[in-house]
From Swiss-Prot:
GO MF annotations, alphabetized: glutamate-1-semialdehyde 2,1-aminomutase activity; pyridoxal phosphate binding; transaminase activity
Keyword Cytoplasm: yes
Quaternary organization: Homodimer.
UniProt catalytic activity: (S)-4-amino-5-oxopentanoate = 5-aminolevulinate
Name this protein carries in UniProt: Glutamate-1-semialdehyde 2,1-aminomutase
Keyword annotations of the record: Cytoplasm, Isomerase, Porphyrin biosynthesis, Pyridoxal phosphate
Modified positions (N6-(pyridoxal phosphate)lysine) in chain numbering: 265
Naturally occurring in which organism (per UniProt): Ruminiclostridium cellulolyticum (strain ATCC 35319 / DSM 5812 / JCM 6584 / H10) (Clostridium cellulolyticum)
Family membership: Belongs to the class-III pyridoxal-phosphate-dependent aminotransferase family. HemL subfamily.
Main localization of the protein described in the UniProt heading: cytoplasm
GO terms for cellular component: cytoplasm
Amino acid sequence: MISSNGLFDRAKKVIPGGVNSPVRAFRAVDLNPLFISRAKGSKLYDVEEREYIDYVCSWGPMILGHSNDLILKNVENVLHNGLSFGAPVETEVQIAEMIVSMVPGVEMVRMVNSGTEAVMSAIRLARGFTKRDKIIKFEGCYHGHSDSMLVKAGSGVLTAGIPDSLGVPQNAAGDTLTAVYNNISSVEQLFQENKNHIAAVIIEPVAANMGVIPPQEGFLKELSGICRQNSALLIFDEVITGFRLAAGGAQEYFGVEADIVTFGKIIGGGMPVGAYAGRKEIMEHVAPCGGVYQAGTLSGNPVAMAAGLAQLEILKSKPEIYEDINKKAEFLGNGFEKIVQKYKAPITLNRVGSLLCGFFSQNPVTNYQEAKLSNTNYYAAYFKSMLNKGIYLAPSQFEAMFVSSAHTYEDIDATLKAAEETLVENISLMEELI
């Protein structure tokens, strides 16, 4: 009989760590990973046919739930035409037109295969456009695994550009400067220390890779102003927030426009798709129009474009989806906070739209250093208990929960019931932490 443990044993013999992305290994929660066989709506099913209410949603793409009928139909309609041509197709034009029509400030779009590729290309474009080298990022924000973005976040190494991964040369990370999220003075200081050398500031408008941390009131607008004053570009990494917070992403949600925007996840409808986009005067610096080179054999893949286009068409034509998922997330968040207050659990909940995270900390969480104070051992205990009750959460304290349109209020009620039972089961551990 096939089992997750058996597959993991086999995988470890031929795949580093047994997984193709580190967080999937479940090491942070001291378990072996589940191997999934299928998914539908709000549910995942492992290879042993156990059912889970899924709040990972493939790390964000499945905003309409798994195996959406319209998306699958769109994919099925193009499959018989061929899987890859290495040539332009109509759907890549259609999806670019769709993005331009939905996202504020975007005039041109270039398709790639992942969020990492999108960010890597956007940074190269910013450097080519401004003819400057340095990039400011924020500690705790994740922008993919390209060398220049893998910079250690913490203490005196923040602005020194010390790599946060073996194999990243010092000079590759040396032009990456690190500021403190939600701290505008840390950004101003970097501009003062590096006058006329900063090409761009890149930020997750909502930091969703250190849990979920919203920007404080006015922070993004001030950041935009500082960039304009210093002739630097503002890059919004909307791989997670794009088409999730609103049809126009974080730019629409917060009313702040960036110069370049990167997309992934939702844009592919579950297929591997990324994109970077911006004003025409910037985007026309990309080859073959300009001298900033970027290419990809599978960029604009016809099958992936069909999936992404179908999802975006649904989101554009049914704006009520956003009100629906936000209300469900609010219902989930409010219910969870009532349980936390009832048992005086040391948990702080952050929510932006349909993104949530419960930090196992009694203190407010507004940046990376505060997020790091969370008790990961307690989160691991919470995760295990919730998983045993059929609730699939991210196997890390520092990841988001995603609510989809496929989640029902019955799903949420079951989740809250499991959460209360879990807190009761771990009450003695909670008391030790308070």
